[in-house]
Structures are given as C-alpha cells and as structure tokens.
Amino acid sequence: MARSIKKGPFVDGHLEAKAQAEQAGSKKVIKTWSRRSTIIPEFIGLTFAVHNGKKFIPVFVTENMVGHKMGEFSPTRTFYGHAADKKSKLKKK
C-alpha cells in the first residue's frame, strides 16, 4: 500500500538538516544509514553514502531518482550466479 498523499514523503529529519547545510557549503559526501528516506528535489546534485549493511555505497542524486527511496540505489545482496550442475560437468569431460 502506498503512503497517503496528505502525509507527504518520509525524510529523516537529520538527513534533511544535513542536506540543507551542504546546499550552502561544500560538496562533501553525506553519510547515512537511513535507507527508508524518500529522495526529495532538494537532494538533487548531492552525494549520499548509503549503508547497505556492510559498507557505504556512494549515490549521486539526479532528477530521475526523486520520489524513490535511498535504499533502492544501494543493493544489500550479492548474486554470484546459480550453482553449477555437477552431472553436466562430468558428462562434458
């Protein structure tokens, strides 16, 4: 179920405050654990380091990302491929 329109997008307060401070000053990377925060238009052009459970993934925010969640751009799982079939390997030799 989608979030109610009257509530507006969810953004952690500390993240919004850091973004406003960065707008005026330097182009430093903003480190965050808040994967649940929605990307708002004020974040365009900023770089966030979003935590994926193990390390921080740098995410540069563009116009196309507005309305999505921070966590969508920081994958938490690594896919190494499906396990090879041992029977088919034996037949090839």
Curated annotation (Swiss-Prot):
Gene Ontology MF terms in the entry: rRNA binding; structural constituent of ribosome
Cellular component terms per the entry's GO annotation: cytoplasm; small ribosomal subunit
Domain of life: Bacteria
Protein biosynthesis as UniProt keyword: no
Transferase as UniProt keyword: no
Keywords: Ribonucleoprotein, Ribosomal protein, RNA-binding, rRNA-binding
Biological process terms in GO annotation: ribosomal small subunit assembly; translation
A Pfam family per the record: Ribosomal_S19
Gene3D superfamilies: 30s Ribosomal Protein S19, Chain A (3.30.860.10)
Alphabetized HAMAP family for the sequence: Ribosomal_uS19 (MF_00531)
Family (UniProt): Belongs to the universal ribosomal protein uS19 family.
PANTHER family associated with the record: RIBOSOMAL PROTEIN S19P FAMILY MEMBER, SMALL RIBOSOMAL SUBUNIT PROTEIN US19M
Function: Protein S19 forms a complex with S13 that binds strongly to the 16S ribosomal RNA.
Record's protein name: Small ribosomal subunit protein uS19
Organism annotation: Citrifermentans bemidjiense (strain ATCC BAA-1014 / DSM 16622 / JCM 12645 / Bem)
